[in-house]
Amino acid sequence: MVATEPSGTGAPRFEKKGILRFVEDSETVLARMDRSTLEYFSSLSKYREAYGPYLDRIGMPSGKYLWQLPESGESFSFEARSLDIFALHDPYFQYEIVKLPEGFCIRTGINVPQFDLPGGARQVQILAGDFVLTASECVQLGILVGKGQG
C-alpha cells in the first residue's frame, strides 16, 4: 500500500495498491490454474498413469491446494507454485493418493503466474462433487496417506 497525504487533512491515506495481487477466477483462470490446462479424473488409475501417485503441499493440512510430486521426488519450486511470500516458511508435506471414492474426482491444471512469480507447477485438487477437499479431509477419508506409509 502507498501512503499519501490527502490535501489539507494532514493524515495519511492508503491506496489499494498492495504488494499481493491475487489472480481471481475468471474465464481463463480457476483456482489459480489456467483453465485451458484443466483435466478431470474420476478414475484413480488413469490419474496415476498420467501423473504418478504422489502429491505434496506447502502449508497446513487445512488447505485445499496440492501439487503433483514427480516420482523422482523433485518437487516443484516455490516460484512455479506462485505462492505468496507469506507461505515461504510454511510446513511441507508429501502424500500418496491411494483411493478415490465413487462420486469424487481429481482436478489438475497448471498454475498461472502471480505475485511476480512465473507459475508452471501442476496443481491438484480432490473434489467431492463440486466441493474441494482439504488435505486433512483427504487423509481422514483415506484418499491420501503420508508418502511411504501406503
Model feature map: region roles:
Residues E5-G150:
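Catalytic toxin/effector domains delivered as secreted proteins or via bacterial secretion systems
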